[in-house]
Design a protein with these regions (language model features):
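Hydrophobic alpha-helical transmembrane segments of membrane transport and translocation systems
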Residues: 531, 538-539, 575-596, 600-687, ...
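Interfacial segments of transmembrane alpha-helices in multi-pass membrane proteins
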Residues: 2-4, 404-405, 409-424, 428-429, ...
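Small-residue-enriched core segments of transmembrane alpha-helices in multipass membrane transport
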Residues: 12-15, 522-544, 555-562, 623-638, ...
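Cytosolic juxtamembrane regions of multi-pass inner-membrane proteins
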Residues: 560-604, 647-655, 872, 878-940, ...
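Non-transmembrane, solvent-exposed regions of membrane trafficking/translocation machinery
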Residues: 22-31, 49, 65-77, 81-433, ...
Length: 1005
């Protein structure tokens, strides 16, 4: 063996590096076990804090460098944030209102929503259509782009400046998000910009148990503003006039709505604000218990028809508070106060904004305040903004209530003093991200630059708000377009199931190798497997990549790849021994002859793994990472390390009589001469019929698409008692109603086999950007299940807590926005096609014959069609989920990567025999090559199926669908290598397959 020194050096370096990085995990375990001995939780945390920064490698270093666990193993939260590129463009254009710009923005938004694409390009194309003959510089020669764009700039120069500014906004947003998460104290977060998806940032936060706090913190743009205000009595007459004009049909759009007003109090206040006649007619008094509910709804509808605004908005409140309204009426009120008629009636310098939280004395009723802000600047912006804040702290006021105290810079302090001096006796509204957090009365001039945000806050609220303000302002609004939340208890169960499946699969592989190849070769292969796992974990830790359940599956599958390499080598050694060579020569020839097949099969798998890594997100990337590492490491351990050991032993005259077979495998597929090629008519007919059945099933039954492809929300709910999915579907029928009155689609499927776990899917308000919709959806789900006596939790908060299992709870949730769903769909199609094209080209380059490329690609396409077809035929008929999601697409690509191994091994043997017998009968040569590799095919497929069956049975629900797809792929991939790929390659070579006689095929001469 050549280059032994390099192999030894690499092995030693890998060993030392793996020991170094894995040692951090052992150190963390030691500190945690010492802390666990302390009973008092506060003292326990004090101990961890005391050692947090001690030593060269402190406890904090160990935490940050140990093996990270993904969400499915540790619990936590995964989100994809989308930075609003349209908002960036509007800021760069200084919020222009001319028709060309506004129409172009509207058209670009519509095109992006319908088809996706680069928003900047969509806008520029739309602008040229809506404003022909006008240059982009007319819109973007603004203060924001001063020095980059002038009125004389060409469109190309403006586009370059816009793209640079958009990228700067995304980069700044990324930094702000990272700072906020660091301040929140998340250990080992994974934050990355998604390549090829402009404006999207993926954030993985293991261990997070309060998703509501994280949603608010991540989506808050920290756009802090200080506004002067109107007094409520100044605005009330305008609102009364607006109400009258809307009721009289002034705008021609307001329709009669049967939505009931929130409370009797609101209606009484409306009456007070109206003339006596209206009061007598529309004041709705409290009914006695016998009153009909239908009659009450009719009166409410009549009141709303007569007073569209004031039947929903209770006037009064004092200072800047012009009125109160139930949260369910705010959408209808917004439609009125932002309507065209409102622009004509209300003062032009008036802005109406809602409070961030319900009013203190009306919190239980979910009543919000409407504040009247006064625009005092020519630009329409607030006179004082958050860029003047130098520090923010969460504190307590004199009454012991949580508040946020802020300090301003010199310029901010000067403006703050002027502003408070000019508004003594009035309120100044403190607005954050478009909602009013507080509007305190100004009692006198405030100098020194101090200010305070108070309100109906909890300690967590003020802490998060202070951290958000200190982290800086987001350059553009961000919203969560995809989200997954996993409870820690579910993560612990996943760890247990993952470890069990891994250990059982590993033990079975070791037993299988010894059973098939005898003790010494079998244990050598097993030693290579152990080293493989050790190196894989070490490299994974050094990359600071999180270990997920799909990642664990990738590691287990890489063991199958490692076994395949050992099987190829051992089968070659057995051939050389049967030809009469000595042990040294047989081992050398076995390793040498198997190298090309191992190299090609591993490289094609690697190509698929890289495609998975670059196109996938979340769990798919976790799987791809460990699989890629496993492929590289298994190649090194199987081809080089085991060779070192054999050479060492044989050079010292040991293992000279080593056996590479057992009574079980001695005659396995030896001397077989099956006539595979002449079966092509039968096998092609079966394949075509199967393809027709599968395609027909796509049209008749379709596929069970997950929210990854449709958009929506998933909630995995665990009940105390077994329930039927049909029962859940009936209970939730009509519960989720969108804002436009349409019913949201709702589904339910069973997860696992205990009958207590159901996954609920709905597309409720999935188009909405409101951060409150997530909470609303969970509340609707809780109320519907509670009403049906399916859950017994006393509050929605307990129902949403994944650790409170008794009484039923949500143990995990997922959200996928419609734009992400479209991108996932296109990404899935492109990734599969790209994988097939990449493998086609590689086979063409390596085998220098298009016939092998065509044969392998057709067979791979059939493999993928078969797996998808079975999912179409079987969904709803088997006791586990067969939804088409991102994980399934990962499985398809993995099937492609694994299946090509079989094809490459067979084609490699055909290529070798073509060189050895250039004048031999081609058909017999093809048959002989397939027969010669049958033992390898059976051993590799069996060992891989052992691994996959362990994952399928023991690995848990989250990985069961993936392993089922892989099982189908291994079975049909093996068959297609023999019955489709080889005959197809032969036919493309221009050969006609002959009908062979009944006797066995003669050996190739």
């Amino acid at each position: 063996m050549q280059n032994k020194g390099i192999v030894i050096c690499v092995a030693v370096l890998l060993t030392l590096a793996s020991i170094f990085y894995l040692s951090f995990s052992f150190a963390t375990r030691y500190y945690d076990s010492e802390a666990a001995k302390i009973k008092d939780p506060i003292a326990q945390q004090d101990y961890k804090d005391s050692v947090k920064y001690l030593g060269v490698y402190s406890y904090q270093n160990c935490l940050e460098t140990q093996i990270g666990l993904g969400l499915d193993l540790k619990g936590g939260m995964n989100v994809i944030l989308e930075i609003s590129v349209p908002d960036v463009l509007e800021n760069l254009a200084d919020h222009k209102t001319d028709a060309g710009f506004t129409n172009a923005m509207k058209e670009a938004r519509a095109q992006e929503e319908a088809n996706g694409g680069d928003f900047v390009s969509l806008f520029i194309n739309a602008y040229h259509k809506s404003a022909p003959g006008h240059k982009l510089a007319e819109v973007f020669a603004t203060q924001q782009l001063q020095g980059k764009v002038s009125p004389q700039s060409s469109d190309a120069e403006v586009e370059k400046a816009i793209r640079a500014s958009v990228q700067d906004a995304i980069d700044n947003s990324f930094n702000v998000v990272r700072t906020r998460i660091d301040k929140f104290g998340v250990v080992q977060p994974n934050i990355q910009k998604l390549e090829g998806q402009q404006g999207r940032i993926m954030v993985e936060m293991p261990g997070i148990s309060q998703p509501e706090r994280m949603r608010k913190m991540l989506q808050g743009s920290a756009n802090l503003e200080f506004w002067e205000t109107y007094n409520s009595e100044e605005i009330a007459p305008y609102l009364q006039q607006l109400d009258t004009r809307i009721a009289n049909g002034d705008n021609g759009e307001e329709k009669t709505d049967s939505v009931a007003a929130d409370s009797t109090v609101a209606k009484k206040e409306v009456a007070k604000a109206e003339p006596k006649k209206a009061e007598a007619k529309f004041s709705i008094k409290k009914k006695d218990d016998a009153a009909s509910k239908v009659g009450e709804e009719a009166q409410n509808a009549a009141a709303i028809k007569a007073h569209p605004l004031l039947a929903r908005l209770q006037l009064g409140g004092g200072l800047s508070t012009v009125g109160y309204a139930s949260v369910r009426d705010t959408a209808a009120i917004n439609k009125i106060i932002y309507s065209a008629v409102a622009k004509r009636v209300l003062p032009s310098d008036l802005r109406l904004l809602w409070s961030a939280k319900p009013a203190d004395n009306l919190k239980a009723k979910n009543i919000f305040e409407l504040h009247a802000l006064k625009v005092t600047t020519t630009t329409g912006r607030a006179p004082l903004e958050g860029d003047v804040i130098t520090d923010a702290k969460d504190e307590f006021d004199q009454m012991g209530s949580p508040v946020v105290s802020m300090k301003m810079n010199t310029e901010g302090a000067r403006k703050w003093a002027q502003m408070t001096k000019a508004n003594v006796g009035k309120a100044i509204a403190i607005v954050l991200d478009g909602v009013v957090y507080s509007a305190p009365r100004v009692n006198g001039e405030i100098d020194g630059g101090s200010s305070q945000i108070s309100g109906n806050f909890t300690i967590e609220d003020t802490k998060d708000l202070a951290n958000t303000l200190k982290s800086g302002r987001m350059p553009a609004p961000a919203r969560i377009v995809q989200e997954e939340v996993v409870g820690p208890t579910l993560g612990a169960q996943s760890i247990q199931m993952g470890i069990v499946s891994f250990v059982v699969a590993f033990v079975l592989l070791m037993v299988y190798m010894v059973m098939m190849y005898n003790v010494i070769p079998g244990m050598m292969a097993n030693l290579a497997l152990l080293v493989n796992v050790f190196f894989t974990l070490g490299i994974l830790t050094s990359f600071q990549a999180a270990l997920t359940l799909p990642g664990l599956a990738g590691m287990v599958l890489s063991l199958g790849t490692a076994v395949d390499a050992n099987v190829l080598i051992y089968e070659r050694i057995k051939e050389e021994l049967r030809s009469g060579k000595g042990m040294k020569q047989a081992v050398a020839a076995g390793y040498g002859n198997a190298f090309s097949a191992i190299f090609d099969s591993n490289l094609t798998s690697l190509i698929t793994g890289v495609i998975l890594l670059t196109t996938g997100t979340g769990p798919i990337r976790g799987f791809a990472t460990t699989w890629i590492i496993g492929i590289v490491v298994s190649f090194f351990t199987a081809v080089f390390l085991t060779r070192l050991v054999y050479d060492y032993k044989l050079n010292h005259d040991k293992w000279m009589h080593c056996k590479f077979d057992t009574p079980v495998s001695h005659n396995l597929m030896q001397g077989k001469k099956y006539k595979f090629m002449s079966m092509y008519k039968t096998t092609f007919t079966v394949a075509i019929v199967a393809a027709v059945v599968f395609i027909g099933s796509f049209f008749v039954r379709g596929l069970s698409k997950s929210i990854d492809f449709t958009g929506g929300r998933n909630y995995v709910v665990q009940f105390e008692n077994p329930v039927e999915p049909e029962q859940i579907r009936t209970v939730l029928g009509g519960a989720f109603v969108n804002a436009d009155g349409t019913k949201a689609t709702t589904g339910a499927i069973a997860i696992g086999t205990d009958g207590k776990t159901i996954r609920v899917s709905t597309n409720y308000m999935i188009e909405s950007n409101s951060p409150t919709v997530d909470d609303e959806a969970e509340t609707i789900l809780y109320n519907a299940l509670k009403k049906a006596n399916l859950v017994s939790q006393k509050s929605v908060e307990a129902f949403k807590n994944p650790d409170v299992r008794q009484g039923g709870s949500i143990i995990s949730s997922t959200k996928v926005g419609p734009s992400v769903a479209k991108d996932i769909t296109m990404g899935a199609i492109y990734s599969v096609l790209f994988a097939l094209i990449a493998i086609f080209l590689y086979i063409l380059i390596r085998f220098r014959n298009v016939a092998f490329s065509v044969g392998s690609t057709v067979a791979l396409a059939f493999d993928a069609l078969t797996v998808i077809g079975f999912y179409s035929l079987l969904w709803g008929l088997v006791p586990f989920s067969l939804e088409i999601d991102q994980t399934f697409i990962g499985a398809i690509l993995t099937v492609v990567g694994y299946s090509i191994n079989d094809k490459v091994v067979v084609f490699d043997r055909i290529r070798e025999n073509l060189k050895l017998h250039p004048k031999g009968d081609r058909q017999q040569l093809f048959n002989a090559s397939i027969n010669e590799t049958l033992a390898r095919t059976i051993n590799t497929s069996t060992s891989t199926l052992l691994v996959l069956l362990c994952i399928f049975i023991l690995g848990g629900d989250s990985i069961r669908s993936f392993s089922f797809a892989m099982i189908l792929g291994v079975v049909f991939g093996t068959l297609s290598s023999i019955f489709i790929a080889s005959p197809m390659a032969y036919i493309v070579l221009g050969r006609k397959i002959k009908e062979e006689p009944a006797e066995e095929v003669a050996e190739v001469k």
